[in-house]
Amino acid sequence: MFDITVDDLYAVYGRLKDRYPIIMTNSMAEDEHFTEDFPLLVAHHHGQTLWLYEYGGDFVLDVMDEAETMGTHWHPIDVDGAAMDIAEFMEGRSDYELFPFPEQ
């Protein structure tokens, strides 16, 4: 653990880009005033958005509903696990539970 790199993120993208409508980007809007600038993979399906990125040598996979009031996240342990989680998300086979986001 803690040996995931941005190259691993691009490896996940390379495995899935021809199968699913996913994108790689270098920034994410947090709200009306802030953005985060780092490579991340983004996917939209069945009213939810998925983000996969590398943070501190670990994969982080976030899923949020369309209203941005419910979500969850987890840490795939490797490229294979991340690719499998995203494929399941895109095919509607995910079984994770969404939790309320705290009010800001």
Summary of predicted features, one role per range:
Residues 59, 94-96:
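Generic detector of bulky aromatic hydrophobic side chains
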Residues 85-92:
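Short, compact, well-ordered microdomains
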Residues 1-45, 70-74, 81, 96-104:
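Negatively charged, low-complexity tracts enriched in Asp/Glu with abundant Ser/Thr
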Residues 47-84:
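Intrinsically disordered, low-complexity regulatory segments enriched in Ser/Thr/Pro
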